[in-house]
Amino acid sequence: MNCTEELESRIAKAEKRYGPFASTHEAMGVMLEEWTELVDAVRSNMLIDIREEALDLAAVCIRLADNLHDIEAMRARSVK
């Protein structure tokens, strides 16, 4: 499976399991968690894990961008 297909699969699974992000802050928290896991994999020089974590991070970023198609709804959920 190529990266694009893997991303599509990960995004679909996450949307089915979790639905849209509750807020931009939730998305940022998930991104930071994935970023930390990617950093750990890079520091360990574990190439398979690096690929997996890079795809996980990319999927979260794309999900956030997709969730912003309805900016007003996201804004309402993201107000302090």
Feature locations, PLM:
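Flexible "arm" and connector segments at domain edges
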Residues: M1-K80
